[in-house]
Amino acid sequence: MAKHLFTSESVSEGHPDKIADQISDAVLDAILAQDPKARVACETYVKTGMVLVGGEVTTSAWVDIEELTRKTVREIGYIHSDMGFDADSCAVLNAIGKQSPDINQGVDRADPKEQGAGDQGLMFGYASNETDILMPAPITYAHALVKRQSEVRKNGTLPWLRPDAKSQVTFAYEDNKIVGIDAIVLSTQHSPDIAQADLIEGVMETIIKPVLPAQWLNKDTKYFINPTGRFVIGGPMGDCGLTGRKIIVDTYGGMARHGGGAFSGKDPSKVDRSAAYAARYVAKNIVAAGLADRCEIQVSYAIGVAEPTSISVETFGTGKVSEEVLIKLVRQHFDLRPYGLTEMLNLARPIYQATAAYGHFGRSEFPWEATDKAEALRADAAL
């Protein structure tokens, strides 16, 4: 019986890197709402008392970057200077310029179906049947913990919580099946007047126990709640934040490979984002069709070229048909050219700010989580 442990982490919406991601995607959404064909690459840097928004944008839209930034920070919960960051008093610097015409000529085409990829690169998508949302369990429950932290902070259940938080969950497996949770780490920013014992009890009873399935917890499960003992200084005052620095949190928690490209602040012509979403869509439909228990898709592109330079499938020995058959099915049922996948998933619209915290995958509100191709895939696989 093969035993192993696997760990994934997540961070809350108030983590500095996630503040940056949410601002970048708020800008993207505001532009796409006015101009669905806009080209946007928006990067954000946050530190004590300041936000710098930069990047390259080609659009007919006008958006108020300063107001968008303040609104986003306010909604996250940084509204007092004693937190080291205040939506209403922080400086907002705008350093956005225009996209290079050299990139435009490689992407734009008279026939939109032949739209070239906005850059070269490789992207991965993954799905696993170990949870009902066809996501790996470690990242799923790591997200659930910090999402719960945000809920009980915002609704006043635990009023001493502050926006910055991190979680980490270690699952125990036997023969690749979950047998329990080995360790849980949850660190949450808090007001200075809460006693450590009260914090630990509140986090355990209000966040951890309602979120993690009791059958996976046992007497040997280890809990680390604010293990340094104090977490008052957090958010951008504790660490600077940058767009695109939480790419494993954003995806599969390390359970699948990653091509290296970040998502937030990028319009759908950037295959770093759109093709990673399409690859998840493909992998999830293959698993939903029962063609594999686990599936990882890789696609790659050349700048200015519409057709992917490669498509590959890995099922880790769980495939019910050969990987050659799966690749043929993928090519038959999914258009993975940049324009095709944007149309297939209806990506040219303002849906991205919601992706920028608590993971881009495993959330039913997003179109790449649909399993509408599963039945046709299963039929054509002739299982």
UniProtKB/Swiss-Prot annotation:
PROSITE patterns: ADOMET_SYNTHASE_1, ADOMET_SYNTHASE_2. Binds 2 divalent ions per subunit. Binds 1 potassium ion per subunit. ATP binds at H15, D164, A165, K166, R230, F231, D239, R245, K246, A262, K266. Pathway: Amino-acid biosynthesis; S-adenosyl-L-methionine biosynthesis; S-adenosyl-L-methionine from L-methionine: step 1/1. K(+) binds at E43. Its EC number is 2.5.1.6. SUPFAM superfamilies: S-adenosylmethionine synthetase. Mg(2+) binds at D17. It comes from the Bacteria. It is found in: Cytoplasm. It is an enzyme of class 2 (transferase). Transmembrane segments: none annotated. It catalyses: L-methionine + ATP + H2O = S-adenosyl-L-methionine + phosphate + diphosphate. L-methionine binds at E56, Q99, D239, K270. Its main location: cytoplasm. Belongs to the AdoMet synthase family. This is S-adenosylmethionine synthase. It comes from Shewanella oneidensis (strain ATCC 700550 / JCM 31522 / CIP 106686 / LMG 19005 / NCIMB 14063 / MR-1).
